[in-house]
């Protein structure tokens, strides 16, 4: 196959940051996506409706594709109220709220200290039909970083799923076979996003032969057996899994340091990277469902009506890309990618 035309895709989990870098991050994300769900862990975090709408306006001011629509999410804290959820839902522009366990990832210090603290907020979300997005890791110091997703599933997410059966939940950027199995065995109200980098890489890529800081992300890359389980889930055709890049840019110097930031930048070539994975598995026919259909169907949003075309054409990823007044190192920098969106 040398060309593949699919319904225009969406990205259901992306970080654009804020300020001067928006001109670059929005350029990449709006190049061929119809919509993108924008993560709210900016500085300061997007904790209320007014902040979300203002952030949306700043994004729209930089968009490059007329077809592009940013979808917004609220950042849940111990102080989030049911009234704020209702207010956000009423805008029609804020489609979800994000649960970050405090300290779990970049700019998550204001996150929720205990999910039970906001059960009344989950009740309101269930009532109005707002989706719950979950960063699925515990933050206890005694739990090994490679085990934090599994521990979260057992101790935090399972009770939420049980206590709120009508709440739609997306387990974001899953990284383990445990998470894939959890989603497969849960009700149809539970789904998951999977990143391109967790499909393409495992912890050996990050650690063998020297530390590769641009592969460092949270949740952290796991062993090969987990990577294979993610590939199987993503390419299976199951409606429970869909595209969410978790593209998370940091300036080159913030990554290549003694205490580097977590996050990998893939928005420059996300669909092309996913296409490589699906082609390698002989499952290109399932890429459209994963990238373009399952996400809007789960969110209850109309599918995009136009298309994009991928061509089998090798191209070189640049060593760096503009990031405001700085630069970012994209995934596969100085390497070739075998598909290209035309």
Curated annotation (Swiss-Prot):
Quaternary structure (record): Homodimer.
A Pfam family of this chain: Amidohydro_1
InterPro entries: Amidohydro-rel, DHOdimr, Dihydroorotase_CS, Metal_Hydrolase
Record text on cofactor binding: Binds 2 Zn(2+) ions per subunit.
GO CC list: cytosol
Pathway: Pyrimidine metabolism; UMP biosynthesis via de novo pathway; (S)-dihydroorotate from bicarbonate: step 3/3
Swiss-Prot/TrEMBL catalytic activity: (S)-dihydroorotate + H2O = N-carbamoyl-L-aspartate + H(+)
Active site: 246
Gene3D superfamilies: Metal-dependent hydrolases
Binding site residues for substrate: 15-17, 41, 135, 218, 250, 262
Role summary: Catalyzes the reversible cyclization of carbamoyl aspartate to dihydroorotate.
Residues at which Zn(2+) 2 binds: 98, 135, 173
Domain of life according to the entry: Bacteria
Protein name (record): Dihydroorotase
Organism: Vibrio campbellii (strain ATCC BAA-1116)
CDD domains cross-referenced by the UniProt entry: DHOase
Enzyme class: hydrolase
HAMAP family registered for this protein in UniProt: PyrC_classII (MF_00219)
Record keywords: Hydrolase, Metal-binding, Pyrimidine biosynthesis, Zinc
EC number: 3.5.2.3
Family: Belongs to the metallo-dependent hydrolases superfamily. DHOase family. Class II DHOase subfamily.
Single GO term (MF): zinc ion binding
């Amino acid at each position: 196959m040398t060309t593949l035309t699919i319904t225009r895709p969406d990205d259901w989990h992306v970080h654009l940051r804020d300020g001067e870098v928006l001109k670059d991050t929005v350029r990449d994300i709006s190049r061929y996506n119809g919509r993108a769900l924008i993560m709210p862990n900016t500085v300061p975090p997007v904790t209320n409706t007014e902040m979300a709408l203002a952030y949306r306006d700043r994004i729209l001011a930089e968009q490059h594709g007329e077809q592009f629509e940013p979808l917004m999410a609220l950042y849940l804290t111990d102080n989030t109220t049911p009234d704020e959820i209702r207010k956000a839902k009423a805008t029609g522009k804020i489609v979800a709220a994000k649960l970050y366990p405090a300290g779990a990832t970049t700019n998550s210090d204001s996150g929720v200290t205990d999910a039970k603290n906001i059960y009344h907020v989950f009740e309101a979300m269930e009532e109005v039909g707002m989706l719950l997005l979950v960063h699925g890791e515990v933050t206890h110091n005694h739990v090994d970083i490679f085990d934090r997703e599994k521990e979260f599933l057992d101790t935090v997410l399972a009770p939420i799923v049980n206590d709120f059966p009508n709440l739609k939940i997306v387990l974001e950027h899953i990284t383990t076979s445990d998470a894939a199995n959890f989603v497969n065995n849960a009700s149809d109200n539970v789904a998951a996003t999977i990143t391109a980098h967790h499909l393409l890489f495992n912890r050996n890529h990050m650690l063998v032969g020297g530390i590769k800081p641009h592969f460092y992300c949270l949740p952290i890359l796991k062993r090969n057996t987990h990577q294979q389980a993610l590939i199987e889930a993503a390419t299976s055709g199951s409606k429970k899994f869909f595209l969410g890049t978790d593209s998370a840019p940091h300036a080159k110097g913030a990554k290549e340091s003694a205490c580097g930031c977590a996050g990998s930048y893939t928005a420059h070539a996300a669909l092309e990277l996913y296409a490589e994975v699906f082609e390698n598995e002989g499952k290109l026919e399932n890429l459209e469902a994963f990238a373009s259909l399952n996400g809007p169907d789960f969110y209850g949003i109309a599918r995009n009506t136009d298309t994009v075309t991928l061509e089998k054409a090798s191209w070189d990823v640049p060593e760096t890309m503009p990031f405001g007044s700085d630069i970012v190192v994209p995934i596969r920098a100085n390497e070739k990618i075998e598909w290209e969106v035309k």
